Amino acid sequence: MDRLPTRVDRGSADWHGRREYNLGLADQLKEYLAAVKNGGGGKYVERHRKRGKMLPRERIAEICDPGSPFLEFSSLAANGLYDGRAHSAGIVTGIGVVHGKECLFVANDATVKGGSYYPMTVKKHIRAQDISDANNLPCIYLVDSGGAFLPMQDEVFPDIGHFGRIFRNQAVLSGKGIPQVAAVLGSCTAGGAYVPAMSDESIIVKGNGTIFLAGPPLVKAATGEEVSAEDLGGADVHTRQSGVADHFAENEEEALRMVRNVVENLNIEPKQRL
């Protein structure tokens, strides 16, 4: 193969100046990416781990085939927005390989404002579903979310491309035969509760996993009744009584293995060998 000649003078001051400038930008990008991978950082990550929970990218890595690639979308979403409090818009999305099958992941980051949805979070979630639709990819939702970020709810709910579109998309994708699989790994409150409820198969973790539209404090305020989160919407309630969830997991590791088992038994063929 012929080599393409270049007229760039690598010895010129201009070339060295441009090189240093672009290397600086590359270093800046690395710093940004390192920051977002730490989620909410500091005490929020520590508190998250004390509850026996993994970070979202760790959860995805546990589900994906060992050594397989993961293509993450929009790592820098919401960069510079919301006073810098919402790294990656509080959600990790991308394509991973599970039992040789390409799957679309949507994983809430509970270290970022409890996994609540900012306007950019909604946009990123819907974009991931659009990619699933266009490429016929099963969706895996790793749910750990308090629903909409209430101080900005006027920017989250009202429009056609806002929060409600997520649930509409789940119904449409399921109707097209694109599997919707959810693992409830933390609190799923308000809007966050609809994702596992509308999935084709859902898994919930004992202790950490809860599904309800309103948590115990709101129940007490509205009715005067005192109830624990586990009794109100825990794993036992939803697998043995309500039927909202299909599989009971003793811990997070077991839940992630169950996700792999569900995908293994999906009646779909791998798109290509990766």
What residue ranges belong to the model's regions?
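Long, structured ligand/cofactor-binding scaffold of large enzymes
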Residues: E46-V181
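Short hydrophobic/aromatic-rich motifs at helix boundaries and adjacent loops
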Residues: M1, H16-R18, E31-Y32, H99-E102, ...
